[in-house]
């Protein structure tokens, strides 16, 4: 892994992959936080390769109790979950609803919310309820059987990662002082897929209560530090469904696209 400050040229076809974990093999002239040989994790460029480049401010030292494979499953999803919960002003004792609780971001959101002292309900498919409970959820809802946003139960914070529920329904399920945080658009939580609802939420929040907002996730080492503390304390751990060697990266992506993954899929080098 090479740590670089900037670059003027980039290849026409970029190597995919953002979350990385590995050993530093070279550093840029202005890098002060890392040296060659350090074990690091974070967000980089071209992670699906033997070597990847990353900005210094997007890396942190790898948690001591994780393997590189485990650490690679943390950066993007866990930081997104942490930022979403913070944006929702999470506090101990609150009731939190995580929609899409069995995915990469959702699984971390369940664990982090529990670590913050919240009472957590996770929405997922019937096949994944046991998995979500194993992450610490106090209650699970099978979205195919039970209405989870009909106003019969209210929450202090709703973190919506699945992106399919109408805003009016989510509003009815919030306490008057509660917050809705939308992570991603309407296309399976993809941040670039279907931004209409995500953009409407903060506009509606100007005129109505409760608070509706969307998350614009940012990658920075400042969020990796509290995550490392939670991980090393045993309060948060990566859930890895499968690992693939680099030459089977396409198979890994196909498994993700199938929508059956519990947690994360990792590519090893």
Q: Could you say what each language-model-derived stretch is?
A:
Residues 228, 235-242, 250-269:
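C-terminal capping/lid region of NAD(P)-dependent oxidoreductase domains
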Residues 149-157:
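A short acidic, Gly/Pro-enriched loop at the edge of an enzyme's catalytic core
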Residues 34-35, 90, 174:
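Short, well-ordered loop/turn sites that connect or cap secondary structure elements
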Residues 1-46, 161:
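Glycine-rich beta-strand-centered segment in the early N-terminal region that forms part
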Residues 72-142:
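Mid-domain Rossmann-like dinucleotide-binding core that forms the NAD(H)/NADP(H) cofactor-binding site
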Residues 161, 165-236, 269:
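Glycine-rich phosphate-binding loop and adjacent beta-alpha segment
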Residues 44-56:
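A structural motif shared across PLP-dependent enzymes of the aminotransferase-like
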Residues 39, 95, 119, 178-179, ...:
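Short glycine-centered segments of the SAM/dcSAM-binding site in methyltransferase folds
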């Amino acid at each position: 892994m090479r740590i670089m400050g900037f670059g003027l040229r980039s290849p026409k076809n970029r190597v995919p992959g953002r979350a990385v974990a590995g050993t530093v093999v070279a550093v840029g002239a202005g890098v002060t936080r890392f040296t060659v040989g350090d074990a690091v994790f974070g967000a980089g460029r071209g992670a699906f390769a033997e070597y990847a480049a990353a900005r210094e401010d997007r890396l942190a030292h790898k948690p001591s109790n994780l393997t590189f494979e485990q650490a690679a499953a943390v950066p993007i999803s866990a930081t997104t979950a942490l930022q979403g919960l913070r944006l929702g002003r999470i506090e101990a004792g609150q009731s939190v609803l995580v929609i899409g609780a069995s995915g990469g971001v959702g699984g971390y959101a369940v664990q982090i919310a529990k670590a913050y002292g919240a009472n957590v309900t996770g929405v997922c498919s019937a096949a994944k309820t046991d998995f979500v409970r194993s992450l610490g959820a106090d209650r699970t809802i099978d979205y195919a059987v039970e209405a989870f946003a009909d106003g019969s139960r209210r929450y202090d914070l709703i973190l919506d990662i699945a992106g399919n529920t109408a805003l009016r329904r989510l509003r009815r399920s919030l306490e008057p002082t509660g917050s809705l945080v939308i992570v991603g658009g309407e296309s399976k939580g993809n941040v670039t897929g279907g931004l209409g609802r995500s953009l409407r939420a903060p506009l509606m929040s100007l005129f109505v209560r409760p608070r509706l907002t969307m998350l614009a996730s940012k990658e920075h080492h400042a969020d990796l530090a509290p995550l490392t503390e939670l991980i090393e304390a045993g309060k948060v751990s990566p859930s890895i469904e499968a690992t693939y060697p680099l030459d089977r990266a396409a198979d890994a992506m196909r498994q993700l696209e199938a929508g059956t993954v519990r947690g994360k899929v990792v590519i090893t080098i």
